[in-house]
Amino acid sequence: DVDVFSHGSQEVSDAKVRELFDEGGYRALDELRSNGDISAIGAGVNEWQVCERLLGLGDFDGFLLAGRYTLLEQEALDSFLPLCIKRDVGIILGGPYNSGILATGAVPDAKYNYDIAPPHIMERVRKMEAVCASHDTPLIAAALQFVMGHSAVKTVIPGAMSPDEVRANVAVFQTSVPDGLWSDLRGEGLIRPDAPLPSERANAV
C-alpha cells in the first residue's frame, strides 16, 4: 500500500510512491511483464487519488480500490475513472457498502468508513432507503449493483465471512433493481447525474 490511509500522511504516501519508482520496484515488475513472466501489474489501495498518481508515472493494468466509488462517494468520476477508461485499466472494487451503512441502512451506530456514521451521512442514507422502499428494493441491492454500472469496474468484492454470506451476496446481486429507482436517486440529487447506471451498461453490451 502506498496511500495516505495506510501511512497516515500525504508526505509518507508520496515518499512510498517515489520509492516504488526510484528504487526499481516498478521497473522490475515492468520487465517481468514484458518478458511474459507476469501478465499484469496493479496495486491495492484505499484512495483513488494515489491510483491516479501511479497512472501518471507508470503503466498499470488494474487496481483494487476499496470503498471509493459507492452510492455515497462518486468523486472518482471527476478524473480517475475516465482516465481508467482511456488507459484500459480495470478496477476491482472493494467496500461497496462503505464498511457497513449501505448494507445495514441508517441504523443506530451504523458504520461509515470504519467509524460511526456522521449525521449528514445518516440523513443521506435515510433518503436513499426511502427511494429504495418506494421501489420495493433493498438498499443493499442498489448499493452492490450501482458500482457495476461503470465500465471501468470489472468486478466487486462485497466481503463475506462464511458460505452463507457468499450465498447472500449472490442473491443481492441477482435482485432485480428497477430503472426507475436509479432515476429517482438522480432526481433527488442522491447520486451524481453523470454516474453511469447498471441499466445503461447492460444496454451498451
What kind of region is each of these model predictions?
Residues 1-204:
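Beta/alpha (TIM)-barrel catalytic core signal, keyed to glycine-rich beta->alpha loops juxtaposed to Asp/Glu
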